[in-house]
Amino acid sequence: MISGRVLYRPAGRRGVGPLPLAATTYALRRRSPSITALGQPRRLIRRWESTSGAVGSDNSGHIDTQPNESILFFDNIFPLKLSSVLLWRAWETNELLRRFNSASLSFLDPIGLVKRAIPESAPIKVTEIIPRLKEGGAYVKFTYPDSISPADIEDQLVKYHEKTPIKPWFNPFRTIKSRLVLGRPWLEDLYRLPKSRLKIEFVPAKNSEPPTELSQESLYSLFRRYGKISDITSQAPDSKVLPKFAYVDFVLVRDAILARNCIHGFVLQEEGSKSLTRLRLSYEQRVKAHHIWNWVTGHPRIVIPVIAAFLAAFTVAVFDPIREFFVKRQTSDILAFRKRGDDDAGLSALFTHRKDLIDSIQNNLLETVGTFIVVQGPRGSGGRELVMDQVLEGRRDVLVVDCRQVVEARGEAGTIRKLANQVGYRPVFSWANNLSSMVDLAIQSTTGVKAGFSENLESQVTKILQTTAEALKDVSLARRKRDKDANLTDDAYLEAHPERRPVIVIDNFLHKSEEKGIVYDKISDWASALVQANIAHVIFLTTDTSYSKPLSKALPDRVFHQITLGDLTPEVAKHFVVSQLETDEDADEKKNGASPAISERKLRRDLQELDECIDALGGRLTDLQVLARRLKVGQSPKKAVSDIIDQSASEILRMFLLTNKGAGSGDKKWSTEQAWYLIKQIASKESLRYNEVLLSDTFASSTTADASNAEAALESLANAELVTIKSHHGRPATIRAGKPVYQAAFNRLLDDAVVNARMDLAVLTELAKIEAKKIDKAEGELSVLGSLPSQPYQTADRVNYLLAKLQGSQEKIVAYEKEMAGLKKVLSEEA
């Protein structure tokens, strides 16, 4: 244990210590009584004045005491945070402390607090006050008579403070404390702010004597008088750090300040030890234990899923309302999809011809049918114009989803971004999934647990469509408050008011369905949910005749409302072209619903050829629009139609005949020979029987590996729009040109001798290879039969059959080669 008295307090050594504090610390001395000019002694007045800027005795940085002189430290004299203002602003210290010194001794004056903290009955004489702004206190040096000890003076002050607590104006919840300075305080101005933890270093009192490390019990006995201690930590026994040290953690910072200023430099002797130990105190930043962080890093299997769930919940709570707002905005923007141009001015004739179809669709939008509306027709048949410009003209709350842009996007991120743009879903962080995938992979490789940060394409598409569905429901119920049926439930109101539901138009449905079928499956399921919940009407626009398969899977128990669009009749096509050529003066007549009349006044003289040209061009809407544009620039009908046919022939030649990369972009399931076979046969017959084509050698026995499946080849050519397959009672029956102008384009290709000879040569070469394979097969079987030890009579019929087949194939090869020789001659002579 520690002895009850101070064993040793060394005197200050001159020239030792830190640099002077200059302007940051002031010593205040009491003035001595002076003599007046008349020789009479002046009445003693207790005033305090600032001394010079020297710190400590002889600028040593320490406070020296003489016999019968001691030091008290008063706490809570200055605001503790005042040092943060003054520490790096030494030029302001003079002005600030001058205010303190010049102020009256009121309760606001810190010097007045010191005076109030010392009772008048105390037998001491204050000789010097040294403020410590950084620590919020002050040293008070005093002298005392021989009849009393400093410890008795300390006890008297402690009792006085307990009986008469003095609370400064800046801290009314804590009283001023004073304690006797036992050690040798160090007046430093370093940037070391007070902390609640003190580091006590045990250094030798004399250079020759090793210090003694104090026990926790001794440290507690020594420091507890200054304030409540939360913990005492001794140095590890195996630590080789010198000097030895210990940590004392106080509950309050001001208690640590009081202990540090009173005990620093204190010399004592541990009970049972012969050597003296000096205590050197300093503030230490307490290292907080990272218990929470350690638990988090130690339990990744629990923490990572929780973080993922929190991020998901945060995303839903913050971003989903914003996304729903943008979806509603895009749905209600009736001008977003209705951007007409000059080419749409003559569609009234077409819409008059299809008025029954328009009325049928509009009637379905006014009823609770609970099924899809499907508008199917070849590309360029005007399905989009029919729906957007006539059926939905003037209707609010229409959302258009173009599947072409979605499925043609590159990568999953592009698909998500395009789908979000179609429905107005923003903000969308399509790039974040790639980053999440890398983070997920890194976590899984280190912890063995999949964090679930990344999402696949299916889940992201589902999330976008679900958010869109919620926004569409809000749109359907937006005008409910002003309706007489406002008291109905949501489901009952939606069922009772089909006219209030928004309309979803899904354009280019099943475009390139073989590439991203999952997108179409999700869109079909989403549309089915909207229809069954009476949230919206759904209209599908498609050119694919096999649309019923994915839609029946999504809505198996309903019959679709199907609208089939075909090519225009010659009369309607003629009206359409003429209406496109109308002048601006005739626009009012067209708006009033009058059917455009054909008169010599409105037609140019060369339009007499229009009937013949339209018969050659056909009734496909896009081709008629091209014809009208050419006529507007001054071309004659024959010249315009001839150019259109030539352009179509060049397109067919480039896409199907003269390259290995057809419409399938490297994944085609047909061969060039098969395409030419159809072109040549349709040019002469206009219509082919489906099964007849399947049985032809070019399709049934193709030598091209990717085109060996005849039905797949025909379906692929139909998807590429080279041909159109017509059905009868649900089965494929006939094959025709992909669009009417292709019929004329096929004939134009046959008129080209070089193209005809080159493609016929390719077909004959393939047919010769097919017959050669038949001969090889027959010869192989004859070789097996000839190797038998005896020739049984049962094999005679088989041998004769094989020989006849071999002979027939050989005759075909001879005929093919003879024809091929003529074709080669044409190729060598024609340019």
UniProtKB/Swiss-Prot annotation:
InterPro entries: Mt_escape_2_C, Nucleotide-bd_a/b_plait_sf, RBD_domain_sf, RRM_dom, Yme2_C, Yme2_RRM. Residues 1-48 form a transit peptide. It is a single-pass membrane protein. One of its GO terms (cellular component) is mitochondrial inner membrane. Gene3D superfamilies: 3.30.70.330. One of its GO terms (molecular function) is RNA binding. Residues 49-301 are mitochondrial matrix. Signal peptide: none annotated. Residues 196-286 form the RRM domain. The keyword Transit peptide applies. Residues 323-831 are mitochondrial intermembrane. Its main location: mitochondrion. Plays a role in maintaining the mitochondrial genome and in controlling the mtDNA escape. Involved in the regulation of mtDNA nucleotide structure and number. May have a dispensable role in early maturation of pre-rRNA. Belongs to the YME2 family. PANTHER family: MITOCHONDRIAL ESCAPE PROTEIN 2 (PTHR32198:SF2). This is Mitochondrial escape protein 2. It comes from Chaetomium globosum (strain ATCC 6205 / CBS 148.51 / DSM 1962 / NBRC 6347 / NRRL 1970). The gene is YME2.
